[in-house]
Amino acid sequence: LQWYDKDKIIYNKINNGNESSIIYDIASKNKIRLNTCIYSINKNGNILSLNYSRLWKLWKSYGYKDLKSINDNKFESKPKNDGIYIINRDFNKNIIFSIHDAVNLCGLNNIKKDFFLCHPTFNFDGDKFVSLLRYFNDSGALISYLICTNLNNGENVILAREKVSHFEWITNNEIIVWCRNLNP
């Protein structure tokens, strides 16, 4: 549940086994349904989203279990067509950072594991976001890479790796994070 403009809220809702979200106008009580779930919204109304079905399949702590797409037979470990999506004010959805590209950035191509991206979070101005690339290693430990994506120039930078957990933007260019290994 998040604010979407000053008089509207937006929340995720499973609709007949499919991802969706509802924009609810508090004043008029009108609803608009989007055919995707949301994660983060910037001040311009752009939305970040991800594949909640994949998230549930790989990490039962998050995601939604009652989605039809969970049993998709086309599952890939490092897909080019899945990752973080951006949805603009006209509700056009496009992939902005693929799992494949994140794996390449982090130099993890030779690791034979299923990867996922999660927690995409805009900075205050909405021109950057961070996300976590994650996988479970052979001993079952959750390995994470915190990546910052600059929407103005498309640059992706690894900020921290290995054990990364909670984070929060404190300014448009600074983030506080719990981790074991910061990138130099």
Regions found by a protein language model. Give the residues of each.
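Residue-level signature of beta-propeller blades and closely related beta-rich strand-turn architectures
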Residues: 15, 53, 135, 181-182
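Asp-box/WD-like beta-propeller blade repeats and closely related beta-sheet repeat scaffolds
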Residues: 2, 8-83, 95-112
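Hydrophobic beta-strand positions in blades of beta-propellers and related beta-sheet-rich domains
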Residues: 21-23, 82-86, 144-148, 184
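Short loop/turn segments that connect beta-strands within beta-propeller blades
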Residues: 25-29, 88-92, 150-154
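Beta-rich catalytic cores
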Residues: 35-37, 80, 116-118, 142, ...
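Blade-terminus and WD-like Trp-Asp/Gly-His loop motifs, strongest in beta-propeller folds
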Residues: 1-9, 39-46, 50-51, 119-129, ...
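Loop-centered beta-sheet repeat module
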Residues: 109-151, 155-160
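Long, well-ordered mid-to-C-terminal structural blocks that present hydrophobic/aromatic surfaces
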Residues: 148-184
